């Protein structure tokens, strides 16, 4: 498992600081604790924006009313803060991997979601050989000394730049894809 420090610093509310600390590109974001904070969204971001619950769930907002509606829904369900994140136009990619806690990457499997459920979960995907994604993963593990399994959620923009959207401190539901390409990450943990 990751250390408590690793777990906390990768929280959505800390993602900008995480990106700055480790030299990883992340979308610009803003933490919102109450309705009065929402007036800043239109000043700091171009629409659309992503409105994220602190633990789970997200919506895309194309105007201030949709930001407000998403904020109310997410804060009622998950509490505050709610995170407003720059919307990155592009294609979603993911990496699952395993760090040894000393900076070494034991395993890493990049993938592209091909079929997505109504909840945004991968129903089908393909592994991809992308050296930049693998290097980004090695950098993440090396700089943070990550311990345990993880999933990196990435967005590749139109300029082919990768942005880190989220770090899940667990193996993803699609972990069997890694087994299928010869990296049995669950077995490596035990």
Q: Which residues does each PLM region occupy?
A:
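Activation loop entry of protein kinases
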Residues: 165-167
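Active-site-proximal flexible loops/turns
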Residues: 41, 59, 93, 160, ...
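Short beta-strand elements of ligand-binding domains
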Residues: 1-3
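Active-site "cap" helix and flanking loop/linker of ATP-utilizing ligase/carboxylase catalytic domains
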Residues: 128-153, 158, 169-190
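Phosphate-binding site of ATP-dependent enzymes
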Residues: 63-145, 155-163
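A short, flexible beta-alpha/helix-coil linker loop
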Residues: 56-57, 115-118, 170-173
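Active-site nucleotide/adenylate-binding loops and adjacent lid/helix of ATP-dependent enzymes
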Residues: 6-90, 100-104, 131-134
């Amino acid at each position: 498992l990751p250390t408590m420090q690793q777990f906390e610093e990768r929280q959505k509310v800390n993602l900008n600081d995480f990106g700055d600390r480790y030299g990883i590109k992340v979308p610009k974001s803003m933490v919102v604790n109450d309705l009065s904070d929402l007036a800043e969204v239109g000043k700091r971001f171009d629409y659309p924006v992503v409105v994220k619950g602190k633990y789970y769930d997200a919506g895309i907002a194309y105007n201030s009313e949709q930001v407000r509606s998403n904020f109310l829904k997410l804060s009622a369900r998950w509490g505050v803060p709610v995170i407003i994140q720059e919307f990155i136009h592009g294609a979603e990619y993911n990496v699952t991997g395993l760090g040894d806690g000393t900076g070494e990457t034991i395993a890493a499997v990049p993938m592209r979601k091909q079929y997505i459920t109504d909840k945004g979960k991968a129903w089908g995907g393909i592994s991809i050989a992308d050296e930049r994604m693998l290097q980004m993963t090695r950098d993440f593990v090396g700089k943070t000394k990550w311990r345990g399994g993880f999933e990196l959620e990435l967005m590749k923009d139109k300029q082919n730049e990768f942005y880190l959207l989220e770090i899940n401190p667990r193996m993803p539901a699609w972990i069997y894809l890694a087994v299928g390409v010869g990296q049995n990450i669950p077995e490596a943990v035990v």
